[in-house]
Design a protein with these regions (language model features):
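Charged docking surfaces used in two-component/phosphorelay signaling
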Residues: 18-26
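Alpha4 helix (beta4-alpha4-beta5 surface) of REC/receiver domains from two-component response regulators
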Residues: 65, 79, 87-105, 111, ...
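Receiver (REC) domain active-site loop signature in two-component systems and cognate sites
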Residues: 58
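Acidic, metal-coordinating helix/loop segments flanking the phosphotransfer/catalytic sites
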Residues: 33-51
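Non-catalytic signal-transmission and effector/linker regions of two-component phosphorelay proteins
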Residues: 1-6, 111-122
Length: 122
């Protein structure tokens, strides 16, 4: 039997965090929650997620800095990182994508996100 995949969600929006948690758990994933970038980085020291979903606009440490630190900490071991944003497409999104991030535009369809997660982890 295949081991359950783990997803780390980093987001300061508790409502969105809850929606994502419920949808991902119902899809069969284990979910770990962090309320900001710093907490997300700390969770990486005690867990080994198969995928990270992070918001871009957060207090203290934004999603871009969080992404950079995750990449540094995981030493580019291939864990997919999704970055959610309500911002219109910015030129620097291409830099994040070149480094391996998947940009998810808000609002998004939860079923589409689940398909993307499933495709990435299968």
């Amino acid at each position: 039997m295949e081991q359950q995949k783990t997803i780390l969600i980093i987001d300061d929006d508790l409502a969105l965090q809850t929606v994502l948690e419920i949808a991902l758990r119902e899809a069969g994933y284990e979910v770990i929650l962090a309320n900001d970038g710093q907490e997300g980085i700390e969770k990486l020291t005690t867990t080994s997620p198969d995928l990270v979903i992070s918001d871009i606009m957060m207090p203290q440490m934004d999603g871009v800095e969080t992404f950079q630190q995750i990449k540094e900490q995981l030493q580019d071991n291939g864990i997919p990182i999704f970055i959610m944003t309500a911002l219109n497409r910015k030129p620097w999104f291409a830099d994040l994508e070149a480094e391996g991030a998947v940009i998810i535009q808000k609002p998004f369809d939860i079923d589409q996100l689940l398909r993307l997660v499933n495709d990435m982890l299968m």
